[in-house]
Amino acid sequence: DNLDQNWLMKFLEHDIADKNFLRYIGRFLKAGVMEGTELQDSDRGTPQGGLISPVLANVYLHYVLDQWYELGLKKHLRGEVYYVRYADDFLLMFQYENEARMVMELLRKRLSKFGLELAEDKTRILSFGKYARSKEEFDFLGFTFFNRNS
């Protein structure tokens, strides 16, 4: 969990007017985590095991990925493009391979700007569908998607 707490607070301030609530969120983020007998300071990410950590991570990714896709990226591509995200797992599906390759580079830059990076072991471009050249498969959210002609 490497999200930038300063960006997260800016994102929250965009939608939340209650300064007291925002102050509590800031304190939660800075509180640190006990590891054994030592308190580990927290200047990045959200505290592991924190009840609201998944919600905060979702807010962060909403601004970093969802808004970027909806308000910017999608408008500049000539082919069909689809985006599905659950927590920090997501798929981008493109009609044209050259657009997939271009967006892969843009995505790396976008994530880097916000202190994030792609999981290289889970990241790839593959042909999929009835005209696909290979029969590769992929896993997403515990399901395996097979590339078959039927």
Model-predicted regions and their roles:
Residues 1-128, 132, 137-140:
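Conserved polymerase palm-domain catalytic core
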